[in-house]
Amino acid sequence: MLDIKFLRTNFEEVKAKLQHRGEDLTDFGRFEELDTRRRELLVQTEELKSKRNEVSQQISVLKREKKDAEALILEMREVGEKVKDLDNELRTVEEDLERLMLSIPNIPHESAPVGETEDDNVVARTWGEVKEFAFEPKPHWDLATDLGILDFERAGKVTGSRFVFYKGAGARLERALISFMLDLHTDEHGYEEVLPPYMVNRASMTGTGQLPKFEEDAFRIESEDYFLIPTAEVPVTNMHRDEILNKEQLPIRYAAFSSCFRSEAGSAGRDTRGLIRQHQFNKVELVKFVKPEDSYEELEKLTNDAERVLQLLELPYRVMSMCTGDLGFTAAKKYDIEVWIPSYGTYREISSCSNFEAFQARRANIRFRREPNGKPEHVHTLNGSGLAIGRTVAAILENYQQEDGTIIIPEVLRPYMGGKTVIK
């Protein structure tokens, strides 16, 4: 959520920056109307309440003096009715303004490339050499099915499309990657491990920006009004909702493994085979709470931490600086890390690393004090995948495949695989 005072005094500047996102700003224009009316109603209500108090005191005096107060009593009733009407209108205007504020995306950072679509994203850097195969490489779903380590067909029978059973070496590879990533981020990168709940309430989804805009993308448990988490970002960020932190606590860095659940409502017909787009998938998420002046340095560190996973796995990748039209709703700046997938003949996203500045913290009321009695300020929040496990499995299967259909296990994972060197 944006700062309403900043928006009020910089309306045209904010509008111009949001236009770079390619957003429909039709409703945005109502901000000035609603904000002005809200302030008018507050003034009118306070004036009438003040008058009501004065009249009430006058009535008390008249009654003590045993004088006729009927006219003032009637006047007070009229004032009371007007106050009630104004309070009702104020409540409606504030609800409309709150809904509008929750629907306004974050302001792009000045360093985000200006553009409309993914074609305008900028390559920040690449790492590793794309392997040239002496044979026609197979897609990971065929490799895994032939090896008996992934079973999409039976998962479809048990649940439906976009689900999978991991079996044998496939299940162990998934588990190995989870342990490897958590060990790396906690032991070498300084994150604290968190295992979060997989269900959250509506306030948590609103705090990180999934609601109200993206409710159709979420799995909701209607009886409780809980949501299955689309990412560990949601519960981990909301750990500190409605809290005031001390300066000495910052930065806070969490690494959280979780399963994630997404309806993929807008992805019908895309990536229908394999692990790239599943309704349920595992992920290690990196979440940071930092002082505002440190957030862009921390974004670079977070992105480097996610990249380190791919470097140790020796998987070629590139880092994209996302343009203003491809930032997503909540980010002020975002890097996508894309790993090379041979069967696609291109790079595919495996991590998004974002700086939300105070956007989430304002929605979730997460603040800190620089001094013991100082005025609370909003922290800046960041997060990134470190990494998406299923897509990492897909990248390993395809990049490490051999002509006979076996898979060489990356060296860094072998201690987690019981010393095995090959999946066959």
UniProtKB/Swiss-Prot annotation:
The protein's annotated pathway: Aminoacyl-tRNA biosynthesis; selenocysteinyl-tRNA(Sec) biosynthesis; L-seryl-tRNA(Sec) from L-serine and tRNA(Sec): step 1/1
Catalysed reaction equations from the record: tRNA(Ser) + L-serine + ATP = L-seryl-tRNA(Ser) + AMP + diphosphate + H(+); tRNA(Sec) + L-serine + ATP = L-seryl-tRNA(Sec) + AMP + diphosphate + H(+)
Pfam families given in the database record: Seryl_tRNA_N, tRNA-synt_2b
Keyword Protein biosynthesis in record: yes
GO biological processes: selenocysteine biosynthetic process; seryl-tRNA aminoacylation
Residues that hold L-serine according to the record: 231-233, 285, 385
Keyword terms, alphabetized: Aminoacyl-tRNA synthetase, ATP-binding, Cytoplasm, Ligase, Nucleotide-binding, Protein biosynthesis
Molecular function as annotated in GO: ATP binding; catalytic activity, acting on a protein; serine-tRNA ligase activity; transferase activity
Compartmental location: Cytoplasm
Chief location: cytoplasm
UniProt: ATP binding residues: 262-264, 349-352
Enzyme Commission number(s): 6.1.1.11
Signal sequence extent: none
An example Gene Ontology CC term for this record: cytoplasm
Top-rank taxon, per record: Bacteria
UniProt keyword ATP-binding present: yes
Self-association and partners: Homodimer. The tRNA molecule binds across the dimer.
Domain text: Consists of two distinct domains, a catalytic core and a N-terminal extension that is involved in tRNA binding.
Function (record text): Catalyzes the attachment of serine to tRNA(Ser). Is also able to aminoacylate tRNA(Sec) with serine, to form the misacylated tRNA L-seryl-tRNA(Sec), which will be further converted into selenocysteinyl-tRNA(Sec).
Family indicated by similarity: Belongs to the class-II aminoacyl-tRNA synthetase family. Type-1 seryl-tRNA synthetase subfamily.
Protein name as it appears in the record: Serine--tRNA ligase
Species of origin: Bacillus anthracis
Gene that encodes the chain: serS
